[in-house]
Amino acid sequence: MITIKKGLDLPIAGKPAQVIHSGNAVNQVAILGEEYVGMRPSMKVREGDVVKKGQVLFEDKKNPGVIFTAPASGTITAINRGEKRVLQSVVINVEGDEKITFAKYSTEQLNTLSSEQVKQNLIESGLWTALRTRPFSKVPSIESEASSIFVNAMDTNPLAADPSVVLKEYSQDFTNGLTVLSRLFPSKPLHLCKAGDSNIPTTDLENLQIHDFTGVHPAGLVGTHIHFIDPVGIQKTVWHINYQDVIAVGKLFTTGELYSERVISLAGPQVKQPRLVRTIIGANLSQLTQNELSAGKNRVISGSVLCGQIAKDSHDYLGRYALQVSVIAEGNEKEFFGWIMPQANKYSVTRTVLGHFSKKLFNFTTSENGGERAMVPIGSYERVMPLDILPTLLLRDLIVGDTDGAQELGCLELDEEDLALCSFVCPGKYEYGSILRQVLDKIEKEG
């Protein structure tokens, strides 16, 4: 078992009851183009087209053969683009239950599948996009290979769902999915990472390796798992996938149908009844959260409060990789002499306010509690960074765009979510996730 001691479990109010409920019905879903790093779409549909579930919507020009399919049947009502015609979202009004079917196999056949059979079914169904690489966090090329594949069956993000609750209901589909993934590269490890005290279903596979992690966040991030088990570099790549996509893989290969249901955490200080709800990938979050939120100006986030995406306008949908929806209040109010008050209702990792000494949960808002200023190395980053890197030096190199120095200090192992805690504790209010992405893009382009 690997124990993570450095990090932070955010004491935020609105923790979800770990019981699965039916969520609000949604009649609109979307694929969010900006979730896929570096993707340039070649559209196969236009507004007004009627599509079936599993039908191709677009293909990645930069990654030929990688296709993106409809999570539900219906009519294409909008193809939203931003600056420089960047694809923001492809919106579908859900109608009917028309679907495209794919190859299916019996449970006994799964362990005899060839790598090519697995790859072909994943690509044709669009489930290939559930896989992501490290470094760079991109959908892998269909011709590439990985040193190993990581399955993340734990989640330490604030307000997250407990994977064991979800997997208890889908244990057979999950083990079927593991079997399928083990056939993708039969001679290479398939790493299943789980919480040490969790009851996660497993199966007896030759290349399956099970790893237990415990401790504070980011113990549940795949970047942490990769760092301690099979570190990556410029010449070495691993792939990873989350546990609910493994369920989808299992269902695809045994039913021949694309499975796009999600069990997510709907939680946060502004949610009336924080709980786990069933919904669909790409669900319209305004519809999903209708009558679920407290009054006032709220920020709905697809993903974690630490590193999720703001859900509004053309991005008002559940992300492809998001397993939670978090809701906090907009912190627009100015405080009179806030900087000299005891602030018993605020939290600080540096113990500068009285709230730090209480054991209560806090109603966090979007307020940064200060403006941007110079980066101040006071040991905050080291407290929350469990990886074997020098965070202050790495963050400095990221800020100034020193790609050589950043590579030497380990930036290729990281994704935006791995630096979310550094952003949270930063006295200078830097957003290190977006800075990291700029550096990674430059490294990939220029070397």
From Swiss-Prot:
EC annotation from Swiss-Prot or TrEMBL: 7.2.1.1
Protein origin, superkingdom: Bacteria
GO biological process, one term: sodium ion transport
Keyword Ion transport listed: yes
InterPro entries the UniProt entry points to: NqrA, NQRA_2nd, NqrA_C_domain, NQRA_N
Main EC class the enzyme belongs to: translocase
Recorded GO MF terms: oxidoreductase activity, acting on NAD(P)H, quinone or similar compound as acceptor
Pfam families for this protein: NQRA_2nd (PF24836), NQRA_N (PF05896), NQRA_SLBB (PF11973)
Keyword field: Ion transport, NAD, Sodium, Sodium transport, Translocase, Transport, Ubiquinone
Catalytic activity: a ubiquinone + n Na(+)(in) + NADH + H(+) = a ubiquinol + n Na(+)(out) + NAD(+)
NAD is among the record's keywords: yes
Positions of disulphide bridges: none
Complex and partners: Composed of six subunits; NqrA, NqrB, NqrC, NqrD, NqrE and NqrF.
Purpose of the protein: NQR complex catalyzes the reduction of ubiquinone-1 to ubiquinol by two successive reactions, coupled with the transport of Na(+) ions from the cytoplasm to the periplasm. NqrA to NqrE are probably involved in the second step, the conversion of ubisemiquinone to ubiquinol.
The family this protein is said to belong to: Belongs to the NqrA family.
Protein name (Swiss-Prot/TrEMBL): Na(+)-translocating NADH-quinone reductase subunit A
Source species of the chain: Haemophilus influenzae (strain PittGG)
